[in-house]
From Swiss-Prot:
GO terms for cellular component: plastid membrane; proton-transporting ATP synthase complex. PROSITE patterns: ATPASE_ALPHA_BETA. PANTHER family: ATP SYNTHASE SUBUNIT ALPHA, MITOCHONDRIAL. It is a peripheral membrane protein. ATP binds at G170, D171, R172, Q173, T174, G175, K176, T177. Keywords: ATP synthesis, ATP-binding, CF(1), Hydrogen ion transport, Ion transport, Membrane, Nucleotide-binding, Plastid, Translocase, Transport. InterPro entries: ATP_synth_asu-like_sf, ATP_synth_asu_C, ATP_synth_asu_C_sf, ATP_synth_F1_a_nt-bd_dom, ATP_synth_F1_asu, ATPase_a/bsu_AS, ATPase_F1/V1/A1_a/bsu_N, ATPase_F1/V1/A1_a/bsu_N_sf. This is ATP synthase subunit alpha, plastid. It comes from Cuscuta exaltata (Tall dodder). F-type ATPases have 2 components, CF(1) - the catalytic core - and CF(0) - the membrane proton channel. CF(1) has five subunits: alpha(3), beta(3), gamma(1), delta(1), epsilon(1). CF(0) has four main subunits: a, b, b' and c.
Length: 507
């Protein structure tokens, strides 16, 4: 007969009691009332938060945007083709966040930070919220460091500083993306991390930008966030915030970043589509009432941080497309009022062969000379005024039959100054090269040359200066000032090269 040992039974029961873990899982769930056009109406989800992520039965993720009395309006981060009416939805208790880190450099990702370049997964342990609040007043400091674009017209007359928001605005096919990509290429060796956000672009256009950056070795320090024209409107709306979160990670790590949004017109259109489908009341041009807030909360995240926070910076170059040069439309006026200046690209200048087609007269940088080195400030001070006077005189000369000698000379000088502002795409110039070019034009050294010879002469002068007067580049790079020694070296080089050039041209 088996003896029952009470102490053993007691021990087993005690162990079982200790192992028992009473867990109560509460889920905030709802059911799908209707789905279509990237929008789902959900019944239930009583405790869902605005902007909270929700998960559908078949795995699609959505964002709760409209919290109404009878149902919740959710925008889908996918096509949602497998979602059925009556299927269950659960709230996740999280808001949208993405992994961030150094591993993203050189990669092409989508708005959910998933790689789309076919080069495998990206491992990262750090996370940032897609939407986070902008730095406050105390967290910032005034902008004082230049961000060189490599384009003479911008660096000399519309200077951009690290931490600035400078709008690039113009009609389609006027070279807006080219200005942005040239700026990225020019950051090589400057210790600046670049983020290029493509919103609603053709996939072929994005591929072309990536190829250009790879060929020039710029992808090493660049992240491309792409949501093409066939992406859901929700992801096109989120892409700029994903880019901003990645740039913020580096900014708060005491690094300098440059972010380009190409372009915010398409983001606004995607947001308008979402809002109209959610039956939000339309306003001007059918955009919802909070479309200004859509862009202001994004662009305010660009900043120059205080010394206490490490002096990191995030410079934003948003791009906005205009229709027939109309800058008084809703989105252009909104973004102009948010940013610290705008670079206006003109279709007329572009078609006249002046590229980059920057209309210097109406372009402005509200940071101004604070974002220029002393050498550039000294040399380029008169350039904008001279070009403005030239434009005025050129308009007058169309109606005048004969001009006096002074006016003719001023016209000739202006034409040469306009010629020296022309640059080939993907050929940014160093600061020393820009100073050399502007100094040569502004002081009349190009007046003796024919207009067609100007670019060839400047190219040869640049090569001659690098080879025979390397001290000039050293002075500009090390002191950031245009010293008497530098000026003497440059004058000497111009004289030598002018003699050689004219002899060669006459031969």
């Amino acid at each position: 007969m088996v003896t029952v040992r009470a102490d053993e039974i007691r021990k087993i029961i005690r162990e079982r009691i200790e192992q028992y873990n009473r867990e109560v899982n509460t889920l905030n769930t709802g059911t799908v009332l209707q789905v279509g056009d990237g929008i789902a109406r959900i019944n239930g989800l009583d405790e869902v938060m605005a902007g909270e992520l929700v998960e559908f039965e078949e795995g699609t993720i959505g964002i709760a945007l409209n919290l109404e009395s009878k149902n919740v309006g959710v925008v889908l981060m996918g096509d949602g083709l497998m979602i059925k009416e009556g299927s269950s939805v659960k709230a996740t208790g999280r808001i949208a966040q993405i992994p961030v880190g150094e591993a993203y450099l050189g990669r092409v990702i989508n708005a959910q930070a998933n790689p789309i370049d076919g080069r495998g997964k990206i491992s990262s342990s750090a996370f940032r919220l897609i939407e986070s609040s902008a730095p406050g007043i105390i967290s910032r400091r005034s902008i004082y460091e230049p961000l060189q674009t490599g384009l003479i017209a911008i660096d000399s007359m519309i200077p951009i500083g690290r931490g600035q928001r400078e709008l690039i605005i113009g009609d389609r096919q006027t070279g807006k993306t080219a200005v942005a990509t040239d700026t990225i290429i020019n950051q090589q060796g400057q210790n600046v991390i670049c983020v290029y956000v493509a919103i609603g672009q053709k996939a072929s256009s994005v591929a072309q930008v990536v190829t250009t950056l790879q060929e020039r070795g710029a992808m090493e320090y660049t992240i491309v966030v792409a949501e093409t024209a066939d992406s859901p409107a929700t992801l096109q709306y989120l892409a700029p915030y994903t880019g901003a979160a990645l740039a913020e990670y580096f900014m708060y790590s005491e690094r300098h970043t440059l972010i380009i949004y190409d372009d915010l017109s398409k983001q606004a259109q995607a947001y308008r589509q979402i809002s109209l489908l959610l039956r939000r009341p339309p306003g001007r041009e059918a955009y919802p009432g909070d479309v200004f807030y859509l862009h202001s909360r994004l662009l305010e995240r660009a900043a120059k941080l205080s010394s206490k926070l490490g002096e990191g910076s995030m410079t934003a170059l948003p791009i906005v497309e205009t229709q027939s040069g109309d800058v008084s439309a809703y989105i252009p006026t909104n973004v102009i009022s948010i940013t610290d200046g705008q670079i206006f690209l003109s279709a007329d200048l572009f078609n006249a062969g002046i590229r980059p087609a920057i209309n210097v007269g109406i372009s402005v940088s509200r940071v101004g000379s604070a974002a220029q080195i002393k050498a550039m400030k000294k040399v380029a001070g008169k350039l904008k005024l001279e070009l403005a006077q030239f434009a005025e005189l050129e308009a007058f000369a169309q109606f005048a039959s004969d001009l006096d000698k002074t006016s003719q000379n001023q016209l000739a000088r202006g034409q040469r100054l306009r010629e020296l502002l022309k640059q080939s795409q993907s050929a940014p110039l160093t600061v020393a090269e820009q100073i050399m070019t502007i100094y040569t034009g502004i002081n009349g050294y190009l007046d003796s040359l024919q207009l067609r010879q100007v670019r060839k002469f400047l190219l040869e002068l640049c090569t001659y200066l690098k080879t025979n007067k390397p001290r000039f580049q050293e002075i500009i790079s090390s002191t950031k000032t245009f010293t008497e020694e530098a000026e003497d070296l440059l004058k000497e080089a111009i004289r030598d090269q002018t003699d050689r050039f004219l002899v060669k041209e006459q031969a």
